[in-house]
Amino acid sequence: MGNGNASIEFVSENGPIDFSVMMQEGVKALTKILSTHLQDNPDLINEKSMKVIFKDNNGKLEPVFAPSEGNSGLINGNDQDENYDEDRDIEEANEDYEVIEFDNEGNYHVCAKGTQNRAIGYDEKVYSKSEHYADSTDTHDYDEDGIINEDNNQLLPKDKWNGHMTRLKNGAISSAEHEVVFEHDNGDNTTFSPAETINDGHMDKRDRSHMHHSGHSEKTGGSCACQENKDSFKYPDHVPNSAPNFRALLQHTVNGKQMCPFCEYYVVFGTPPAYIMRWASSKISAEHSQYKMNDQIVDGDSGDMDRNLDSVETNEMNKQQTKKKKKKSKRKSKR
C-alpha cells in the first residue's frame, strides 16, 4: 500500500499472515509516516519509504521498520537500528521556528526553517505588488463577469427607478445620482439613499414610518465622504469588465470619512449593487403597506368599533350566565 511516493512494503518471515492483521499494521505504519514532517518537507518523502518485517516473537507479530533498499541501503537483520525513526522525530520536534516577514507588512506567518521559498512560491520568485496587479488582469474571466451582471440585472426592481442604471454604467456620475426613486402604485414617490437609511438605523419604527409617509428623508450631510461636497465629488471612470479596483476605497476617502456602502461597491466593481436595490425596494414597499393599514385603522368608523365592543361584552355576559345555570343544575342533581 502507498500514499503518493511514500510506500510501505510488508514482508512476513513466518509464512502467510492474517489479512486483517496486515491491514491494521499497515494503517499504523502509514499513520506514523503522515504524523511526521512529510507535509513540511516533501523532499524527504523518498527517505520515508520503508519496509515492514513481521517477526514471530513468542506468538506475537511485531513489525520492524527498515528503510527501503533504494534510499538508505540494506540494513542486515538484527543489526538494524530501531531507534532510527525516533531520533529523526525528536530532531524535527526540537527544530526552531522563525517569523518570516512577507511583502505585505502586518502579515506574519510562522514557518519552519527551510520552508520560506515554498511559502513565497514554488518557482522561488518574489513578485512585487505592481507585477501582481498586472498579472491579475491577464487571468481575469470576462465571460464570468458578463454572467454575473446579467443575473444581477434580473434581480433589479422593474419599473421602480428612473433611468439611474444607465447613468451608473456610463461612467462618472455625481454623488446625488446614486439616489434611487421608487414609484408606488398610489402615485407616491420615495427617494432612497443607502447612506441615509444606514445612518438613520437608530430611529424607532414610529419615526421611520413618519419620515417615510412624508415622502422624503432629512439629509444627513457630512456623514459620508460621498455626501460631503456633493457638487464637486465625482465617481471615477470604470472600464467595463475590468478587475475590481479596491484601491479606490483609499483614494476617495475624504477627511478620514468613508463612502457609503452603495458608493464603495460602485467604485470597486463599476456596477451598482443590485442586491442592495432589491432589498431597499422590498423594505420600502413593506413599510408603505404597513403604514397604509395603520391609517385605515385610525381613520375607521368609531361607531363600528363601539358596536364591536358591545358585541364582545354581550358574548361574555352570555357565557357567564351559561356557567351559572350549569352549576345550579349540578346542585339539583346532587340533592
UniProtKB/Swiss-Prot annotation:
The keyword Lipid biosynthesis is assigned to this record: no
Top-level taxon of origin: Eukaryota
A GO biological-process term: mitotic spindle assembly checkpoint signaling
Region ranges (Disordered): 203-225, 296-335
Keyword Cell division appears in the UniProt entry: yes
Basic residues composition bias: residue spans: 321-335
Comp. bias intervals (Polar residues): 311-320
GO cellular component: cytoplasm; spindle pole
Cell compartments where the protein resides: Cytoplasm, Cytoskeleton, Spindle pole
Record keywords, A-Z: Cell cycle, Cell division, Cytoplasm, Cytoskeleton, Mitosis
Family per similarity comment: Belongs to the IBD2 family.
Job of this protein: Part of a checkpoint which monitors spindle integrity and prevents premature exit from mitosis.
Name recorded for this polypeptide: Protein IBD2
Taxonomic lineage of the native organism: Eukaryota, Fungi, Dikarya, Ascomycota, Saccharomycotina
